[in-house]
């Protein structure tokens, strides 16, 4: 296979937006043969489907005989939409398994299909959890998990994009495109149900802050220290195992300690104490390993380091992570995650997280392009230091960064020539996803080395708060200190006018020479004071329920 194809596959996660947000063509996912339901049932289905991005497909799928019970409650309609998504997900998995079977000898296509299978397994877990959460009345959890299911389906579609060299792959991509629409519809109905309750007639087409729509929320607990909400790393944790470089304790590698953690550990935390030292390894915390905790001896003292990058044959951005976490409830404190791939070495992730209810405190993330991959679900970073240059905080999670130091580092072999750097590249693909990046009381600055370059010739060094990786990119900075290296424009387009009408980039009560909004791009926003509380740690990621220091 050509090296060009391998490289393209390695970059699939930075592909252009999928058909989930740009295409509106016909597809064959979940085609049904509707039987005319009663007029009252049909009216209920139509009203519910009016709250979706793909209402005709929604009506067709839910009108199938027996899909929705007679005289349904709104929550039953949503359950039916989730069930239909799950049914199509299982079909998609079968189609991709067939691609694996027919791709013997084709490394690129085999790798892409296997990546799809793994991603759709995650999507399956999250879809099942969504249905269970709705039954328990946990609507915020349901929305978070269905948002993640959609992320994995989109990434599966993207994984096939660069190996679309057979009709079988093309047909499977079309089916995945339809699956994305089906899942989007279920998620959209959840958002309306959360905001407007059982009155289906009041449910609305998906809208965002950019449209002037602000969700119903509670008080802004955790928006600033004065609220008294005591969130952070729990005290008094005792280690279950210890890792040390000399091998004189329980384990010599971090991965061996992770492997020793029990699977599906309930609510009990499994604490791994990682002694001072440099651990050269790539670590995976798999889906089955929940509530794993890393505790080091301090930033720069306990260091987990790797050097994988997306320029290597067969390596995707997702798989470059020095530490990659999928198991829920992951926590870390007092250590450094590092990827040493140089600034000319493509995407190279130091830390990637798909962990829901994840809390990282007093940790350091060092890299260049794509340092921190907050891929999906709810994450809370507190008192951390994050360093990089190109899109170095990216992904499609719901992540809050509080009291963090965000540092731009020199980017290229000849950095004195100048460059454009974006701190964030948030990747929300659907307006109903409960995802986005929130920065509270953070410092945005450069490393000492970078600031020397910047001050020597500020006109050639352009630094931005973010750029839109996907259509509905959402990032806000609240109460942050923006230093002089932030350009007056503030925000950078991705390409042309892509996403500029649908993104939401907001600022509120920032300080410092880079906070002046008088020259900001017209497609960024000042967050209305009465809506700033939407982005508190309690409202945005429900951290008051899972990140208590007394937990």
From Swiss-Prot:
Protein name: Probable pectinesterase/pectinesterase inhibitor 51
Similarity field: In the N-terminal section; belongs to the PMEI family. In the C-terminal section; belongs to the pectinesterase family.
NCBIfam families named among the record's database cross-references: PME_inhib
Chain's role: Acts in the modification of cell walls via demethylesterification of cell wall pectin.
Residues bearing carbohydrate: 50, 108, 164, 445
GO annotations of cellular component type: extracellular region
Keywords: Aspartyl esterase, Cell wall, Cell wall biogenesis/degradation, Disulfide bond, Glycoprotein, Hydrolase, Secreted, Signal
Short name of one Pfam family: Pectinesterase
Tissue specificity of this protein: Expressed in siliques.
Gene Ontology terms: biological process: cell wall modification; pectin catabolic process
Main location: secreted
Signal peptide interval: 1-20
List of residues binding substrate: 317, 347, 467, 469
Catalytic residue positions: 370 (proton donor), 391 (nucleophile)
One MF term in the entry's GO annotations: enzyme inhibitor activity
Disulfide bond sites: 384-404
Keyword 4Fe-4S belongs to the record: no
């Amino acid at each position: 296979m050509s090296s060009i194809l391998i490289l393209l596959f390695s970059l699939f996660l930075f592909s252009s937006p999928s058909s989930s947000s740009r295409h509106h063509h016909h597809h064959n996912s979940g085609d049904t043969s509707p039987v005319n339901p009663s007029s009252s049932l049909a009216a209920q289905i139509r009203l519910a489907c009016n709250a979706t991005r793909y209402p005709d497909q929604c009506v067709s799928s839910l009108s199938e005989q027996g899909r929705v019970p007679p005289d349904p409650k709104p929550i039953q309609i949503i359950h039916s939409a989730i069930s239909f998504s799950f049914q199509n997900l299982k079909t998609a998995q079968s189609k991709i398994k067939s691609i694996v079977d027919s791709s013997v000898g084709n490394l690129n296509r085999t790798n892409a299909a296997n990546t799809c299978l793994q991603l759709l397994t995650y999507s399956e877990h999250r879809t099942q959890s969504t249905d269970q959460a709705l039954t328990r009345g946990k609507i915020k959890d349901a929305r978070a998990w269905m948002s993640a299911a959609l992320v994995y389906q989109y990434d599966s579609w993207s994984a096939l994009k660069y190996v679309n060299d057979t009709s079988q792959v093309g047909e499977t991509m079309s089916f995945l495109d339809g699956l994305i629409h089906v899942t989007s519809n279920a998620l959209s109905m959840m958002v309306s149900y959360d905001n407007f309750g059982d009155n289906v007639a009041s449910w609305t087409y998906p809208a965002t802050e950019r449209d002037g729509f602000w969700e119903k929320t509670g008080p802004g607990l955790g928006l600033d220290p004065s609220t008294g909400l005591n969130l952070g790393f729990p005290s008094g944790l005792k280690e279950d195992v210890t890792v040390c470089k000399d091998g004189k304790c329980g384990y010599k590698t971090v991965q061996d300690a992770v492997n020793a953690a029990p699977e599906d550990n309930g609510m009990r935390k499994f604490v791994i104490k990682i002694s001072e030292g440099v651990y050269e390894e790539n670590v995976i915390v798999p889906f089955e390993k929940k509530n794993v905790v890393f505790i080091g001896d301090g930033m720069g003292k306990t260091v987990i380091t790797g050097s994988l990058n997306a320029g290597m044959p067969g390596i995707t951005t997702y798989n470059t992570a020095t530490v990659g976490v999928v198991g829920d409830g992951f926590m870390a404190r007092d250590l450094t995650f590092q990827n040493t791939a140089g600034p000319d070495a493509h995407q190279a992730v130091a830390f990637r997280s798909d962990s829901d209810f994840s809390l990282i405190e007093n940790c350091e993330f060092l890299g260049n392009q794509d340092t921190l991959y907050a891929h999906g679900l709810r994450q809370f970073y507190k008192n951390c230091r994050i360093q990089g240059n190109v899109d170095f905080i990216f992904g499609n999670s719901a992540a809050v960064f509080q009291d963090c130091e965000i540092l731009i580092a020199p980017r290229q072999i000849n950095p004195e020539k100048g460059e454009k750097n974006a701190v964030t590249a948030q990747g929300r693909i659907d307006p109903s996803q409960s995802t986005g990046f929130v920065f509270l009381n953070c410092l945005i600055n450069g490393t000492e080395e970078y600031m020397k370059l910047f001050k020597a010739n500020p006109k050639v060094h352009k630094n931005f708060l973010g750029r839109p990786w996907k259509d509905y990119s959402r990032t806000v900075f609240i109460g942050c200190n923006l230093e002089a290296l932030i350009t007056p424009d503030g925000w950078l387009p991705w390409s042309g006018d892509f996403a500029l009408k649908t993104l939401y980039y907001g600022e509120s009560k920032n300080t410092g020479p880079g906070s002046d909004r008088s020259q900001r791009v017209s497609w960024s926003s000042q967050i209305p004071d009465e809506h700033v509380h939407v982005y508190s740690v309690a409202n945005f990621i429900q951290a008051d329920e899972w990140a208590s220091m007394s937990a």
